[in-house]
Structure formats: structure tokens, C-alpha cells
């Protein structure tokens, strides 16, 4: 199966890519244009052969590395290459290694394959490797691509999903002249060598839709100005962050619940800032849910549309100098909106919500909740009054972010 992600480029379905990984085949994994915008050859480490290493060295031309889990790195006694990682993408290199036995110089395709197999072997110990060497292990973040959207994590995730050891092999794809191959060239490379290709973004979406990423820790009663709610405390299994859900009444899977997914805004929600409409939307949603007698407000800890409190305050300063909210984020090197609604969707599902009426002015939230076993039956707008301080902000949300105001 092939999925079409743009008018020009077609990518393979993750299930098909995982199937090839399980069979010991090489695939291409690409990342986002906002990141490295590169493609890597990727395969499972325990399936590596001298021929595969030679293919990567000959046709990929990049550095051949072996992404592994942190647990595996500790088992093998692999220390980080540097104490302070200043590499742009924070790729977590360990010291380089060779196999302790069965190799000569360590650089041949045969020798490197032998070393990679030793790294992937669950029975290997630190004594089975020598340092330094000609193979470069990389430590993947716990949580894989759901924690860090990198090729390192993608390689380990794909191996795990194929029921293999959490270790991969990767190599960047370069042009003949040594420059990085970009997406058009990667598609031609894929056709020439009959390889499957996927994006890290599609792998993230695949995992988010299939894995439970939140756990319920506590439920308490919460009396408010808008009536009594049940306050549910959830913890993300990815980063330990806590999120909240205020539930009114009893959730009935057959009756669409009134739902609001609200991202934290300290300045608006707590200090009643007039620079935004967040606090007004929060209270309007609580009022509407209370009047309905049945519904959920999910409170996500995604301050500043996901960029964090400090970055938001810096963006405020740029707005005072004349930039709008989107331009200010861009000036800081940040996307206009970094929020992820996948965890919110999983919280709703865990609460028993299946069909819902969605309190939102943001179409992106609708898209963000799709694919999690939830069905939106109605989009309900939240109407709040503008003021002289947030008028430009609201106009920018409407024109540049597509909000329905």
C-alpha cells in the first residue's frame, strides 16, 4: 500500500516498511524539511550482512551508524562520545567500536557487519567489543520517535515493531558530489534500487494511533464557579508530564459528549491577560459544559501553543516591537503551533468518549483528534469578545492559523 502525502511524492505505508525490516531488507527513512531534510538507508542490525554494509557504503556514502536503545548501550558499557553534546540535532554518539573477535582491521564490509551483529546480539557483553573502532553506535531516546523525531529513534522503533532486537543500521544518502540528497533525489534513488520509503512523521502518527501513551493516576472532586466536576489526573508515559481532564456528568458512549481540549496559558488562564483570548475561552467552555450537564474539558500542558512559557514571553516582546504572533515565533526559530493533540485524544478515549461535539474555533484540533477511535459529530464555536489588546492577535489567528473567528 502506498500513501500519498503531497501532490508530488508518494510514500509507503508503515506496515509495509516494517514488513521489509523484518525480512532484513533496507528501507529509506526521511525526515522533515524543517529539520535535517535528509534520507537515510535503514535496516535491522541483527539482519545485517556484508552485502548490506557494502550497499550502504557504496550507494549511501554517508557514515554507517548503529542506533541502539539506552538499555543496550548500558549492557555493552558504551559511554557517550562527549560529555557535552553540541551537535545541531543532539545525535547521541557513543564511543566507536569493533568486534573483539572475528575481524581484521575492522573497516571492511565483512568486519563492520561482524561488529554490528555483535552489538545486536543480546548475549554480547562489553568484552565482545573493543574501543575505539570503525562502527559508531548511537543512543536512541526512550520513547523513540515520540520523544525525538530523528533517524536514530526511527531505526530502533522499526526494529522493535518488526519484533527484532532494538538495534538498527543507518547511513545517510549522499549525491555523487558528496552533498546531501533531498526528497526528489531520494524518490529517484528509491525507484532505482526498488526500496520502500517512509517519513518519520508517518511513523510518529502510526505509533500514536496504536500505543497507549497516558495513564490515569487519580480522580478527585472539584467544586468550581461552574458547578462540580470530577478532576482526572493523567500522566504522559513519554515525558512524565501531567495533564488534566475535568468531567461533568456521566460519559455515555452512545451520546455525543461536549468536549473542549484546552492548552495551558498561564498568562491568560491565571492572570487574566488581555493579550490573548485563552482565559475567556477556558471559562466559556467550562460554563457551556456545565450548562450541558455532560462533557469533558481536557487541560493540556502545552504552554504558548507548545513552545513553552519562556519562549512565549520572548515572543511577546517581539510582538511589542511590531511582529504578529506567527512572525514572532518564526523570528525565534519556532513553528507557529507546536501543539500535539494525540495525548488529548487518548485521554478522551480512556474516559469513554467515542462520539463528541467539539468546542473549538481551530480546525487543526479537529484533524489532531482523528484516527484515535473518536468521531466528531459537530464543531461548536466558542464566541468570546475581542478587546483592544488582542484584536491583532485574533486577526492573525484567523488569517494565518485558520481559526474560525
Region spans (language model):
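Catalytic domains of riboflavin
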Residues: 1-405
Amino acid at each position: 500500500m502506498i500513501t500519498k502525502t503531497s501532490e508530488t511524492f508518494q510514500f509507503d505505508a508503515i506496515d509495509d516498511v516494517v514488513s521489509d525490516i523484518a525480512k532484513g531488507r533496507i528501507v529509506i527513512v526521511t525526515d522533515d524539511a524543517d529539520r535535517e531534510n535528509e534520507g537515510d538507508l535503514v535496516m535491522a542490525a541483527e539482519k545485517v550482512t556484508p552485502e548490506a554494509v557494502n550497499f550502504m557504503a557504496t550507494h549511501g556514502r554517508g557514515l554507517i551508524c548503529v542506533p541502539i536503545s539506552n538499555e543496550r548501550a548500558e549492557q555493552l558499557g558504551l559511554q557517550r562520545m562527549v560529555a557535552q553534546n553540541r551537535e545541531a540535532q543532539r545525535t547521541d554518539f557513543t564511543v566507536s567500536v569493533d568486534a573483539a573477535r572475528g575481524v581484521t582491521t575492522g573497516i571492511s564490509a565483512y568486519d563492520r557487519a561482524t561488529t554490528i551483529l555483535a552489538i545486536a546480539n543480546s548475549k554480547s557483553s562489553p568484552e565482545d567489543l573493543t574501543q575505539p573502532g570503525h562502527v559508531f553506535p548511537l543512543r536512541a531516546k526512550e520513547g523513540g520517535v515520540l520523544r525525538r523525531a530523528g533517524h536514530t529513534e526511527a531505526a530502533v522503533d522499526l526494529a522493535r515493531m518488526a519484533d527484532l532486537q532494538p538495534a538498527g543500521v543507518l547511513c545517510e544518502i549522499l549525491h555523487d558530489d558528496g552533498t546531501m540528497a533531498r526528497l526528489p533525489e531520494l524518490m529517484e534513488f528509491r525507484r532505482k534500487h526498488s526500496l520502500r520509503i517512509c517519513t518519520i512523521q508517518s511513523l510518529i502518527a502510526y505509533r500514536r494511533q496504536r500505543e497507549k501513551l497516558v495513564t490515569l493516576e487519580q480522580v478527585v472532586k472539584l467544586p468550581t464557579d461552574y458547578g462540580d466536576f470530577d478532576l482526572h489526573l493523567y500522566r504522559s508515559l513519554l515525558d512524565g508530564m501531567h495533564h488534566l481532564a475535568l468531567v461533568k456528568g456521566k460519559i455515555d458512549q452512545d451520546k455525543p459528549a461536549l468536549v473542549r481540549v484546552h492548552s495551558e496559558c498561564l498568562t491568560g488562564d491565571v492572570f487574566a491577560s488581555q493579550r490573548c483570548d485563552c482565559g475567556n475561552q477556558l471559562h466559556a467552555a467550562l460554563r457551556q459544559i456545565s450548562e450541558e450537564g455532560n462533557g469533558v474539558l481536557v487541560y493540556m500542558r502545552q504552554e504558548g501553543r507548545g513552545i513553552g512559557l519562556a519562549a512565549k514571553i520572548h515572543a511577546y516582546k517581539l510582538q511589542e516591537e511590531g511582529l504578529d504572533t506567527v512572525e514572532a515565533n518564526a523570528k525565534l526559530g519556532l513553528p507557529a503551533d507546536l501543539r500535539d493533540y494525540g495525548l488529548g485524544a487518548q485521554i478522551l478515549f480512556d474516559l469513554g468518549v467515542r462520539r463528541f461535539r467539539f468546542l473549538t474555533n481551530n480546525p487543526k484540533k479537529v484533524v489532531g483528534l482523528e484516527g484515535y477511535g473518536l468521531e466528531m459529530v459537530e464543531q461548536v464555536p466558542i464566541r468570546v469578545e475581542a478587546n483592544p489588546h488582542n484584536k491583532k492577535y485574533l486577526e492573525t489567528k484567523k488569517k494565518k492559523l485558520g481559526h474560525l473567528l
